[in-house]
Swiss-Prot record:
This is Cyclin-dependent kinase inhibitor rum1. It comes from Schizosaccharomyces pombe (strain 972 / ATCC 24843) (Fission yeast). The modification Phosphothreonine is found at T13, T58, T62. Changing T58S: Shift in mobility. Interacts with cdc13, cig2 and pop1. Induction: Expression increases in nitrogen deprived environment, which is important to cause delay of the G1 phase of the cell cycle in response to nitrogen starvation. Its main location: nucleus. GO terms for biological process: mitotic G1 cell size control checkpoint signaling; negative regulation of G1/S transition of mitotic cell cycle; negative regulation of mitotic cell cycle; negative regulation of mitotic cell cycle DNA replication; negative regulation of mitotic DNA replication initiation; positive regulation of proteasomal ubiquitin-dependent protein catabolic process; traversing start control point of mitotic cell cycle. Changing T62A: Reduces growth rate into small colonies containing many elongated cells. Phenotype enhances due to increased stability.
């Protein structure tokens, strides 16, 4: 197979419209035919489409003086700088505190307007409204247990005891059972004493004497020894 020689420069070589060599051949042929032709006379249809760059545009390298012309760069080493002037009109730290600093006041919450009463039942706030003109001062809330329990009766002796009468504290009613009456009679015999001193109970309330476990064990040992000697 013979090696193919590359085409000569300046000659139009056949190529496909998609290949970049077609546009190069058109320009070379036009330059050879008329050397005084200008590039501007080439129709735009023959120019290649500009390639779209996928990279972000590079920032313009513009000096800061042109970007911010109003910004004045001052030399901090210059000792002849103009000192800052105090603005006494808008500076609260340089003026009187009575005019600028206001005293803090606690906000008093205003109660919402209401034309009824509020109840709290099982953690929920319930409002009960009344007709306008109703005197709420005479209104009494309903009792939680308006009716008495069925087990209670009027024969209960404690129902007649006044809880506000402190003189009745410690006195048992006489119509209790026999044990209560006995304890009530023994209580009346005990002399009154201060709360700090100890008073021995009467003989009727004392426990009967009993033998200690050590003494009972020693008695059983002696009995067993006596039985063995027999």
């Amino acid at each position: 197979m013979e090696p193919s020689t590359p085409p000569m420069r300046g000659l139009c070589t056949p190529s496909t419209p998609e290949s970049p060599g077609s546009f190069k051949g058109v320009i070379d042929a036009s330059l050879e035919g008329n050397s005084s032709i200008m590039i501007d006379e080439i129709p735009e249809s023959d120019l290649p489409a500009p390639q779209v760059s996928t990279f972000p545009p590079t920032p313009a390298k513009t000096p800061k003086k042109q970007l911010l012309p109003n910004l004045m760069l001052q030399d901090r080493s210059n000792s002849l700088e103009r000192c800052m002037e105090e603005d006494r009109e808008h500076n609260p730290f340089l003026s009187s505190s009575d005019n600028q600093l206001l005293s803090r006041k606690k906000r008093k919450p205003t109660p919402p307007p209401s034309d009824g009463l509020y109840y709290v039942f099982r953690g929920k706030r319930i409002k009960k409204s009344f007709r306008p003109g109703t005197d709420l001062s005479t209104f009494k809330p309903k009792l939680l247990f308006a009716d008495s329990a069925p087990s209670s009766s009027s024969d209960n002796p404690t129902s007649s005891v006044d809880l506000n009468d402190y003189s009745q504290i410690g006195i048992l009613p006489p119509n209790l059972n026999s044990i209560g009456n006995k304890m009530f009679s023994l209580k009346s015999r005990v002399p009154s004493s201060s709360s700090g001193s100890f008073v021995a109970p009467p003989p009727q309330m004392r426990l009967p004497a009993y033998s200690s476990p050590q003494k009972s064990r020693s008695n059983t040992k002696d009995e067993n020894r006596h039985n063995l000697l027999r």
